[in-house]
Structure formats: C-alpha cells, structure tokens
C-alpha cells in the first residue's frame, strides 16, 4: 500500500504560475513557500510556555505574486477545500482604516499578516496561493499560509526583525484574524525547519535546538483521520483558559513553572477537571525533554514509549482525542515495526503521527486501513526545510 504522494514544491510552483497567468494575464515576479508541520511530541504545551518537538514537512504552501501600483490586494486560492469565494480583492490598510476579518475565512490569515506587518511602505499586490497541506488536518495549514505570506511581503518590503519577531507577527495574525489563541510553535517551525532535523523549541525563551532525524531506517508516518475540525469554535480556547486558571491558582505565571509535585500538593486549589488538564501539560513538558534526548541518542524505543504516554494523557487528562484518533493509534500500535504512535495537532480529529521502521511502512499502512472504520489518508515525510524564496 502506498502513501499519498502530494505534489512537490516544484509542481505546486508550476500550478501557481499557471493560475496566476490565467487570472492576471502576466507571469508572477515573486514566489515563496512555507511548510506544514507535524508535532512529534509536546502537545498543547506551546501556549503554556512549554517545550515542543515539531518537524517541518514536505507538504507546503506556495505563494506567487507581483506588486501593483493601485494599493489593492487581489488574491486567488486554488484549494478546493477552502471556503468560498476563492478570489477576493481589498485595499491595503491605512492609519485610518484597518483590515477586518471576514469571509472567506482562508483569506483572514493573509489579511492578518498584512495588518500586523512591521515594515512600510507595503505596496498592493496580486497573488495566487497553492497548497499541499491539508486544511483542518492538524498539520498547520494556517501557519504555513501565514509564514508564506510574511515571506512574500519581505520580498516586497524588507523587514529588519528577528525570526522570533516574524513568528510573533504571524501568531498575532492568527489570534486577531482567525480567533485562535495558538502558541508560537507552528510559526517558528515553518520559519526555522531544517532538512534532516526536528526542532526542539522552548516556548518560554523561544530558544531552539536542532535534533537529528535523518536515520534512513526510520520513517515518520502521518495518518489523517479525515475527520475535520475547526479549532476556533471548538474546545481549544477553553483548554487554554483552564490552564491559565490553574497556573494562577498555584501562584505561577504559567504551567511551565509548575512541577508535578507542586500540582499534586495544590490539588485542593483547583477543580478536578483543571487538575487533569494541568497534569497533562506538566507531564507532557517533561516527556518532550526526555523524547528529544532519546532521539539524540538514537533510542527510538524510548521515544516511541513517550509518544504512547503522550497520547494516553491527551485522551484521558486533556480530553482532546476522539474515537477515530484512538482507533488509528491502537491500530498502529498493533502493527509490526512500530515504535510509537499518538494524536498530533489540536485534536478532535486531524492526524496521528507514528514512528516506525521504514521497512514495515506498507504493512503498517495496510493494517491501519483494515482496522480503521473510516478512510485514512497517509503521508510519509522526511524532516524538511522552513520557509524559502523560490526561483525558476
């Protein structure tokens, strides 16, 4: 059985150029790409100032375009999963008139980055967006689009900010224009991904360190449950609030500062549900540090065990899994050659990530598909590079 073979960046670039020529009657002058990501471990820890261990994917968003002199932004997406309309036009923001989120929802990510972009003067532009990152699959199609937009704007009007500052602009765009109070992980990995490496991110200090992930005998399998979720209207903001409430009750700025022993000692100060939410986060931060160390020393069995512990904690304490994700994880763990498997992303649908011996890949996919009550889509990805300017 074969994994889905999404188009490579070169094919997406050709599609984007073709669509741009059809829409705007000229060849685009600029092209950029930014990847999706899979988080290997460290779930729902980023907005708690914890540790995360994502890798950038070969699934990317490509944005091509050209500046224009009339102060307008004209956008087109070729994504069939994006909400209508697929094309729209709006004026650049001014001191008197800010951009506002609206419909289509996909364009809000672009608008948000434009609104918060720190350099000036920004010209109007025409652009086409093409992406192989599945929408709502927990692989961060949103940050991929935000970072692609930011990288494109840099070509039109260079900025002088740090990588962390760029990530924060994209994060702010998601907060204010998509209504999702996300952490900074997705934007940082989309900017800083490096081929053959995962990236350990400290979401408190924003320090990053590369963790080797290029062992040829190893495979990272992403399984999409094809259950769609929309985080903005779901339980995500509630989980964030619960974590903040527990930290406050314990007199801490964030759950990053809380040890498991302190949480146990302060159990009476928080609700039962709040305790479970915090127990997940505090344990997950510890697991992520242990997992990065295991990967560095090539101990894939230890890494796999930590992945499974993470899934159980997300299912039982954080309660963001769902029957489909649990089914996919159980199926993977009952297949040969699998080190570990867990849900990844915000939850309530989306994807699982499985670490396995590469030689068992076809067998494992076949087994999962047979065991799963829905229809799964598989992606095999190497750890890839972050955002880049494309040339042809």
Curated annotation (Swiss-Prot):
State the Pfam families in the record.
GalKase_gal_bdg, GHMP_kinases_C, GHMP_kinases_N
Q: Which GO terms describe its cellular component?
A: cytoplasm; cytosol
EC primary class: transferase
Keyword entries, A-Z: ATP-binding, Carbohydrate metabolism, Galactose metabolism, Kinase, Nucleotide-binding, Phosphoprotein, Transferase
The EC number of this protein is 2.7.1.6
| Quaternary structure (record) | Homodimer.
Q: What is this protein called?
A: Galactokinase
List the source organism.
Answer: Canis lupus familiaris
Gene name linked to the record? GALK1
């Amino acid at each position: 059985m074969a994994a889905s073979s999404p188009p490579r960046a070169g094919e997406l670039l050709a599609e984007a150029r073709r669509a741009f020529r059809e829409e705007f009657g000229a060849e685009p002058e600029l092209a950029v790409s930014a990847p999706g990501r899979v988080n290997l471990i460290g779930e729902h820890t980023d907005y708690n100032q914890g540790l995360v261990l994502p890798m950038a994917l070969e699934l990317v968003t490509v944005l091509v375009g050209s500046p224009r002199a009339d102060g307008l932004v004209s956008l087109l997406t070729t994504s069939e999963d994006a909400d209508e309309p697929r094309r729209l036009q709006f004026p650049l923001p001014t001191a008197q008139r800010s951009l506002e989120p609206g419909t289509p929802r996909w364009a809000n990510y672009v608008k948000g980055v434009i609104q918060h972009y720190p350099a000036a003067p920004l010209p109007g532009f025409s652009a086409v967006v093409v992406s192989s990152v599945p929408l709502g699959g927990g692989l961060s199609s949103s940050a991929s689009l935000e970072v692609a937009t930011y990288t494109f704007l840099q070509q039109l009007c260079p900025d002088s900010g740090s990588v962390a500052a760029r990530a924060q602009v994209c994060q702010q765009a998601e907060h204010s224009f998509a209504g999702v109070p996300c952490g900074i992980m997705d934007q940082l990995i989309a900017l800083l991904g490096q081929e053959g490496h995962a990236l350990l991110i400290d979401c408190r200090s924003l320090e990053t360190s590369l963790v080797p992930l290029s062992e040829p005998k190893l495979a990272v399998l992403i399984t999409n449950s094809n259950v769609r979720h929309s985080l903005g209207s779901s339980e995500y903001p509630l989980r964030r609030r619960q974590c903040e409430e527990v930290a406050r009750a314990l007199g801490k700025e964030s759950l990053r500062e809380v040890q498991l022993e302190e949480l146990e000692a302060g159990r009476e100060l928080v609700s039962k549900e709040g305790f479970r939410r915090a127990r997940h986060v505090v344990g997950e931060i510890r697991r992520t540090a242990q997992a990065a160390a295991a990967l560095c020393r090539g101990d894939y069995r230890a890494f796999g065990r930590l992945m499974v512990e993470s899934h159980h904690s997300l299912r039982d304490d954080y309660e963001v899994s769902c029957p489909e994700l649990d089914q996919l994880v159980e199926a993977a763990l009952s297949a040969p050659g699998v080190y570990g498997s867990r849900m990844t992303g915000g939850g309530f649908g989306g994807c699982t990530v499985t670490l396995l011996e590469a030689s068992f890949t076809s067998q494992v996919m076949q087994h999962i598909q047979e065991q799963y009550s829905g229809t799964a889509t598989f992606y095999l990805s190497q750890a890839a590079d972050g955002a880049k300017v494309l040339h042809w």
